[in-house]
Amino acid sequence: MRRELLLEKIETYKAVMPWYVLDYYQSKLAVPYSFTTLYEYLKEYKRFFDWLMDADLTQAPKIADIDLSTLEHLTKKDLEAFVLYLRERPSLNTYSTKEGLSQTTINRTLSALSSLYKYLTEEVENDQGEPYFYRNVMKKVSTKKKKETLASRAENIKQKLFLGDETLAFLDYVDKEYEQKLSNRAKSSFRKNKERDLAIIALLLASGVRLSEAVNLDLKDVNLNMMIIEVIRKGGKRDSVNVAGFAKGYLESYLAVRQRRYKAEKQDLAFFLTEYRGVPNRMDASSIEKMVGKYSEDFKIRVTPHKLRHTLATRLYDATKSQVLVSHQLGHSSTQVTDLYTHIVNDEQKNALDNL
């Protein structure tokens, strides 16, 4: 979604929200949370407040009038009823054959609500220096996680990674072979964005940054001499990220055409740009996801930018056998998250079994 459209949608949601959600929005914007994250959270709050009104758990005539007392006095049973509503809602439509929302989607909804409740009960201060209320019912609502061993998850993910020589082979394919399959009209569009697209893919494969971190990169954040980029991690922490040397040529090629091809002026700070009717804009997450999916599907298998992050992490662990180094590269505060990569590259167990 283009940044301008995203901001418009955010303003639309803000216009119907209670004052304390607007306070929450301002607080998280200062962290800063990304606009994409805040947009998704506002969507979840709208859905939740709509349900409160439909379920007669508030007497407010509109969402903006739902008071803090309503949230404070919701019970665990109320929240469980909301979860059940999310899980079964589509099946209530006579014309729909869909199952309920996935557990992943439900968990995301509950995560958004947990963030709001934590703000209201712990983080915010009223005139007396106290939170708005103390009872956090979200702490009593459990989420169901998909049961899967690390080994099983690693095996599933491994099929969608570009390991070994495939990392550079993927870039070479986009650079030299992809165009051969295109019509003349499609070739024109491809050639216009070729350097940019290659630079994005190379950066993701060479640094392991999150999609949102790549989207929010500005020119000032990229140091090609040192091969370091500055990003805003989750939680608003600024971090310096090393970039593998193989990405340098692709990034330099893009920078050589960025200003001319995308009509960039001094005020256009975004590193990755798109151009529509002569107006440059920051390239959005959705466009990058589609671009990565398009090229990867033609090369081997359709993947997301997050799988390119997994690719870098796996290759880095394979080369160093250091979970600490990998966790630092990815911006994680502990090595627990990187346990997955030890399973992806762990061939010792298989070799031992083969020798029995």
From Swiss-Prot:
One of its GO terms (molecular function) is tyrosine-based site-specific recombinase activity. Keywords: Cell cycle, Cell division, Chromosome partition, Cytoplasm, DNA integration, DNA recombination, DNA-binding. One of its GO terms (cellular component) is cytoplasm. Residues 16-121 form the Core-binding (CB) domain. It comes from the Bacteria. The active site is at 210, 234, 306, 309, 332, 341 (o-(3'-phospho-dna)-tyrosine intermediate). Residues 169-354 form the Tyr recombinase domain. Its main location: cytoplasm. One of its GO terms (biological process) is cell division. It is found in: Cytoplasm. FtsK is required for recombination. Signal peptide: none annotated. Belongs to the 'phage' integrase family. XerS subfamily. PANTHER family: PHAGE INTEGRASE-RELATED, TYROSINE RECOMBINASE XERC. Site-specific tyrosine recombinase, which acts by catalyzing the cutting and rejoining of the recombining DNA molecules. Essential to convert dimers of the bacterial chromosome into monomers to permit their segregation at cell division. This is Tyrosine recombinase XerS.
